[in-house]
Amino acid sequence: MAPYRLDVISLAPQAFAPLPEVGVIGRAFGAKIAELHLHNPRDHAIDRHRKVDDVPYGGGAGMVLKPEPVFAAFESVPVCSRRRVLLMSPQGQPLRQVDLQRWSQDYDQLVFLCGHYEGFDERIRSLADEEVSMGDFVLTGGELPAMTIINGVVRLLPGTVGTPESLVEESHSDLLLEHSHYTRPADFRGMTVPDVLRSGDHGAVALWRQQQREQRTQERRPDLWNRWQQIQNPTPPAP
């Protein structure tokens, strides 16, 4: 199977240097489960000063990323059979676990468009299939959001995580948050491991963990709890 291809268009490609070197994600790159390719729009600038930004039409603060070098960098990227182009933007849809699952399963290539400066020329949006946000805040560029998505997608690819079962019950895999975990010692500074986890009763452990997931979600993320409840108890159609 060909490696999952990740192409990043960024003015700060050096920011991605640690990705292939760290943890299970680094090992996935080393094992050719995924490949990372970096493309700098500055390498495609058309003037001798390699200019990639300019002042905004209509005036205003800051500089705007020019379309020409970004389009040229984008058009230099090889196209795989199942490609998805993601624009990192605070105006995009908030990232969800279901998005990471969809991208890891339905595609074999992701292309990331990372903005900088005050923003990017509006015409750059035409390149994207989706716009993705990390939340209701603004960063200096799209590199950190892109790295977050790369981490989240690569860890879901077959062969990355040694125990695939560990991905099944983790937080957000089915809208519920993950249950609590304990390891030795059984008693630490008066904080003890629940008896059920030491009982050897696998059915009781599974029930306790599910109850923990529901309780945590209800307390910490009522928005997710309400969505989960709606799925479990759908409203019947009106007669």
Swiss-Prot record:
Compositionally biased intervals (Basic and acidic residues): 211-224
Domain of life: Bacteria
Region (Disordered): 210-239
Record-linked Pfam families: tRNA_m1G_MT (PF01746)
Family: Belongs to the RNA methyltransferase TrmD family.
Annotated keywords: Cytoplasm, Methyltransferase, S-adenosyl-L-methionine, Transferase, tRNA processing
Gene: trmD
InterPro entries: Alpha/beta_knot_MTases, tRNA_m1G_MeTrfase_C_sf, tRNA_m1G_MeTrfase_TrmD, tRNA_m1G_MTases_N, tRNA_MeTrfase_TRMD/TRM10
EC identifiers of the protein: 2.1.1.228
Database matches in CDD domains: TrmD-like (cd18080)
Matching NCBIfam families: PRK00026.1, trmD
Subcellular location: Cytoplasm
Residues annotated to bind S-adenosyl-L-methionine: 115, 134-139
Predominant localisation class: cytoplasm
One MF annotation (Gene Ontology) recorded for this entry: tRNA (guanine(37)-N1)-methyltransferase activity
GO cellular component terms listed in the entry, alphabetical order: cytosol
Catalytic activity: guanosine(37) in tRNA + S-adenosyl-L-methionine = N(1)-methylguanosine(37) in tRNA + S-adenosyl-L-homocysteine + H(+)
Protein name: tRNA (guanine-N(1)-)-methyltransferase
Subunit structure: Homodimer.
Keyword Signal applies: no
GO biological process: tRNA N1-guanine methylation
Function: Specifically methylates guanosine-37 in various tRNAs.
Residues forming coiled coils: none
Organism lineage: Bacteria, Bacillati, Cyanobacteriota, Cyanophyceae, Synechococcales
Gene3D superfamilies the record matches: 3.40.1280.10, tRNA(m1g37)methyltransferase, domain 2 (1.10.1270.20)
